[in-house]
């Protein structure tokens, strides 16, 4: 019988994941030494040693079905920009983006347990572990999203060779080549301006209340009377909408138009209303703290095998 203590001890000795340790122990009939060999053979122990290292580089990739009705976006991280352009790494991220578009998984954990799209003898997790062992860097599937539309289309935009990725979902009752042009323009807008919300109607009350409080304190700190401060808040809220809500933003290609006005003009050309129903923007490594190390320390760690 495999006990929790056995799994814990093996994990401490190898650094491998809990489930991997449990599987190895079962395969080894409870023999810890044999389980270590199994983990090493699978590259899991070696991968685990790298798992504590910060992976803030990587790629954002998208995939769109031929009919433009289904799309996916994924971010996979690695440690260096050198590995981020490696053909094997790029191929893995491309394949993963396609797999996500066909998948019903909603979490990275679920996706990791799926059979890998280009080699169903391995799971996504096993394929990633093999890639970690081959390229010698920690890697992680960080996040992904999937969009689908029945009437309309989805378009993507990748900026900086995978530094920023965007999906934009348009809804329209009529099919038109103009939709693709509009979606691409909006996707570039999202990449450039990083809006927080689709429209002012989608700004949640907690965020709005917080911003109003900040604006009021700012006005009072500027020496404005209470009543004047309240009027200033109204103006600054409108400015906040214009800066952070996609529909309210000035179009980067023509600052005489807002995105809303641009959509209305294109809707007339198509002969039916065009609506942005969703957008997703991933920026590689955003929110991940990058670890800075000096060269001497890096060499020392390599010599010590860390």
UniProtKB/Swiss-Prot annotation:
Any one GO MF annotation of this record: translation elongation factor activity
The cross-references to InterPro entries, in alphabetical order and at most eight, read: EF-Ts_dimer_sf, Transl_elong_EFTs/EF1B, Transl_elong_EFTs/EF1B_dimer, Transl_elong_Ts_CS, UBA-like_sf
Q: Which UniProt keywords apply?
A: Cytoplasm, Elongation factor, Protein biosynthesis
Map out region (Involved in Mg(2+) ion dislocation from EF-Tu) in residue numbers. 80-83
Task: Give the source's domain of life in one word.
Answer: Bacteria
- Cellular location(s): Cytoplasm
Name the major location: cytoplasm
Provide the Gene Ontology terms for cellular component. Answer: cytoplasm
Q: Please indicate if the UniProt record lists Protein biosynthesis as a keyword.
A: yes
The UniProt similarity line reads:
Belongs to the EF-Ts family.
The UniProt function text for this chain reads: Associates with the EF-Tu.GDP complex and induces the exchange of GDP to GTP. It remains bound to the aminoacyl-tRNA.EF-Tu.GTP complex up to the GTP hydrolysis stage on the ribosome.
HAMAP family per record: EF_Ts
Q: What is this protein called?
A: Elongation factor Ts
């Amino acid at each position: 019988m495999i006990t929790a203590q056995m799994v814990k001890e093996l994990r401490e000795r190898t650094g491998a994941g809990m489930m991997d340790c449990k599987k190895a122990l079962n395969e080894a009939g409870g023999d810890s030494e044999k389980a270590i060999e199994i983990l090493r053979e699978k590259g899991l122990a070696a991968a685990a040693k790298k798992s504590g290292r910060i992976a803030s580089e990587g790629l954002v990739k998208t995939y769109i079905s031929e009919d433009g009705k289904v799309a996916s976006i994924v971010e996979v991280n690695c440690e260096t920009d050198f590995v981020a352009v490696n053909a094997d790494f790029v191929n893995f991220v491309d394949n993963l983006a396609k797999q996500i578009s066909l998948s019903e998984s909603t979490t990275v954990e679920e996706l990791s347990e799926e059979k890998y799209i280009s080699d169903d003898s391995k799971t996504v997790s096993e394929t990633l572990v093999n890639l970690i062992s081959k390229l010698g860097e920690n890697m992680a599937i960080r996040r992904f999203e999937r969009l689908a539309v029945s009437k309309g289309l989805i378009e993507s935009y990748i900026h900086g060779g995978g530094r920023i990725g965007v999906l934009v979902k348009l809804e329209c009752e009529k099919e038109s080549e103009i939709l693709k042009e509009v979606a691409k323009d909006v996707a570039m807008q999202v990449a450039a301006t990083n809006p927080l919300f689709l429209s002012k109607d989608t700004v949640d009350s907690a965020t709005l209340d917080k911003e109003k409080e900040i604006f009021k304190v700012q006005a009072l700190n500027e020496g404005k009377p209470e009543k004047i401060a309240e009027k200033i808040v109204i103006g600054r809220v409108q400015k906040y909408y214009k800066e952070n809500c996609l529909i309210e933003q000035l179009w980067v290609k023509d600052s005489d138009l807002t995105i809303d006005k641009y959509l209305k003009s294109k809707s007339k050309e198509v002969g039916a209303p065009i609506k942005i129903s969703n957008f997703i923007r991933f920026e590689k490594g955003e929110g991940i703290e990058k670890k800075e190390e000096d060269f001497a320390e890096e060499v020392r760690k390599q010599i010590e095998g860390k």
